[in-house]
Amino acid sequence: EQVMQYGEDDLTFVSRLLSEVGIWFRFATDARLKIEVVEFYDDQSGYERGLTLPLRHPSGLFDGETEAVWGLNTAYSVVEKSVTTRDYNYRTATAEMMTEQHDATGGDNTTYGEAYHYADNFLQKGDKEAAESGAFYARIRHERYLNEQAILQGQSTSSLLMPGLEIRVQGDDAPAVFRKGVLITGVTASAARDRSYELTFTAIPYSERYGYRPALIPRPVMAGTLPARVTSTVKNDIYAHIDKDGRYRVNLDFDRDTWKPGYESLWVRQSRPYAGDTYGLHLPLLAGTEVSIAFEEGNPDRPYIAGVKHDSAH
């Protein structure tokens, strides 16, 4: 119904929205403009490539002046074989909204089971290429599961390691997955008087079939209701601004921004005691009336008018 920020700072809010659609970002320096920029990617085109390091453990403070990696570890988990999503859209209430099982592995027989997710906030079933459709979310979710299938770790003296970098490790003793190429997803740097500079990194196997997906940041859970007032496009209007589907626009009390009158929110549905295709009960609300806004499954993006209240002004 809308996109709402509540109880979260700006970075968390933006990161949450990006994580839901599988977009990751990084900070970089624009060499031409000489300014810091933020780059957003959702596929392998954003990876940095071309770094190959040998497998070699440094000796104390002496690393032979050669950047290398060591202490390589791999951890494997069985993840879901496919993902199915489903949602409900009252605008097309009879439309089939459950997607087919999506398998992004291309036939990997080490995966098992099906993950079923409801209410991913999509309006149509669509296909895997249709942005923010049911099939799109099924694909993104399965790729996120596959990112957890193999978690790789290691240490390095290379200052070039950073998230989004693909590296290969040379050496017959290196695990095959590192020799084929891995994508760095996180780094931690450390140094001390009695130790040389080193990085601890985490990575996932590089894949052309699917890319890195950031961990899903959970939405805030809206407990109870929030107060709001029904609005209109006309000042001192006798009736509120209402559309053909009986929806209203409301001004949420916590919102500090100033909006054009009658456009403080997107259209919000109203819960009624009686409704049908050719019958129902609708008592029109007046501009300024206090209403209680509830949220489907506590989702801040799915508000509806749950009730109307008297107050000192109305």
Locations of the language-model features?
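Amphipathic alpha-helical and helix-coil boundary elements used as assembly
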Residues: E1-H314
